[in-house]
């Protein structure tokens, strides 16, 4: 992927500033790391519309500490009055217990230069909401699931957003007038082959009220699709199936060809293809990579960014192909071992 539309990063005293709540997201998404990838990438993309890369410098979140975020994500108790999730009502039945609604929170800071100094000019907060809450009735016991309706998820998300906004306004570095972009994310279930997606955002230019929410209309789908009607554009599903069939028929030693595609409405925004092989020789991998490049140019949708990762059955990345939205040909790289 080209590095055209990316933020400059803030470096302080020759060191990169890591997020103060670093590691919380990994723990919160340990059962489906695709959620974390989709969450972080999507959050930065939504921020670009509000805080353009030409005018702002990116800083990892420095205002919310790890302890603060962990307390907010926990249940509300006497010892933790700041918990955004409801207190445990003691019930064990899936439809009677109080589920965990808010699963993850991430802060991103956007800086601008004034008089040779960088100062905070905007904050983005991502809030990840559960559609399913997984729990055990006893320690180390079986895992059960509470389903959360879309309506309830959105209602609890707006409550959490209002509380977080009010708390951020009390932070001295943010104050009353720093724009805060709040982005709402729907977590994918643990067994999903794609990460979740952002469903709404709101901008607070100042104060603690959120005047309106904007729907993103973003959706992630897995290809090949078991039901083509679940893909916003059926032509993309057909194109991918042709690519998959050609690729698999040419090389018999393939374990699988899948893709994650992201849509905004019916418009494809990008695609990441994963191919698992059982190749061992360098010549096989190189020949296969050349073939995949030709098939991708022929069959995969044009005009959008596409990444293709070729992995061995042990998970080792053997080759990588990439094409930006304005390009026809693919950049390819085969990983040698020395």
Describe the predicted segments one by one.
Residues 2-7:
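Short, small-residue-biased leader/transition segments that mark boundaries at the very start
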Residues 8-134, 150, 154, 158, ...:
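N-proximal, solvent-exposed amphipathic alpha-helical segments enriched in charged/polar residues
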Residues 118-124, 177-179, 268, 303-305:
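Extracytoplasmic
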Residues 128-132, 185-187, 278, 313:
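Solvent-exposed coil/turn segments that connect beta secondary-structure elements
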Residues 138-153, 271-285:
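A short interface-forming secondary-structure element
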Residues 146-174, 283-305:
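Short, non-transmembrane amphipathic alpha-helical segments
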Residues 167-179, 187-195:
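Extended, H/D-rich, highly charged conserved domains that either
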Residues 228-233, 240, 244-338:
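Hydrophilic extracytoplasmic domains
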């Amino acid at each position: 992927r080209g590095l055209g539309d990316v933020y400059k990063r803030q470096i302080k005293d020759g060191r990169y500033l890591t997020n103060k709540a670093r590691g919380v997201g990994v723990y919160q998404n340990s059962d489906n790391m695709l959620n974390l990838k989709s969450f972080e990438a999507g959050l930065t993309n939504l921020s670009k519309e509000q805080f353009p890369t030409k005018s702002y410098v990116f800083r990892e979140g420095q205002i919310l500490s790890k302890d603060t975020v962990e307390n907010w994500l926990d249940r509300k108790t006497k010892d933790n009055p700041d918990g955004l999730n409801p207190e445990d009502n003691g019930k064990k039945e899936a439809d009677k217990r109080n589920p965990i609604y808010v699963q993850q929170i991430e802060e991103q800071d956007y800086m601008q230069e004034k008089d040779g100094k960088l100062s905070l000019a905007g904050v983005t907060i991502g809030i990840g909401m559960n559609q399913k809450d997984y729990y055990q009735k006893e320690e180390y016991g079986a895992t059960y699931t509470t389903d959360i309706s879309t309506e309830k998820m959105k209602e609890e998300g707006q409550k959490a957003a209002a509380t977080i906004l009010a708390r951020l306004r009390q932070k001295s570095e943010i104050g009353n007038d720093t724009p805060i972009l709040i982005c709402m994310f729907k977590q994918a279930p643990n067994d999903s082959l794609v990460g979740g997606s952002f469903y709404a955002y709101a901008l607070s230019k100042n104060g603690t009220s959120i005047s309106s929410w904007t729907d993103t209309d973003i959706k992630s789908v897995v290809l090949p699709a078991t039901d083509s009607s679940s893909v916003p554009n059926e032509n993309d599903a057909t194109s991918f199936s042709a690519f998959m069939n050609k690729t698999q028929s040419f090389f018999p030693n393939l374990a699988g060809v899948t893709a994650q595609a992201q849509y905004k409405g019916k418009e494809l925004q990008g695609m990441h293809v994963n191919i698992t092989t059982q190749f061992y020789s360098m010549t096989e991998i190189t020949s296969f990579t050349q073939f995949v490049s030709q098939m991708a140019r022929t069959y995969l949708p044009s005009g959008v960014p596409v990444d293709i990762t070729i992995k061995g059955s042990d998970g080792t990345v053997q080759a990588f192909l990439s094409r930006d939205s304005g390009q026809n040909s693919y950049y390819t790289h085969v990983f040698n071992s020395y």
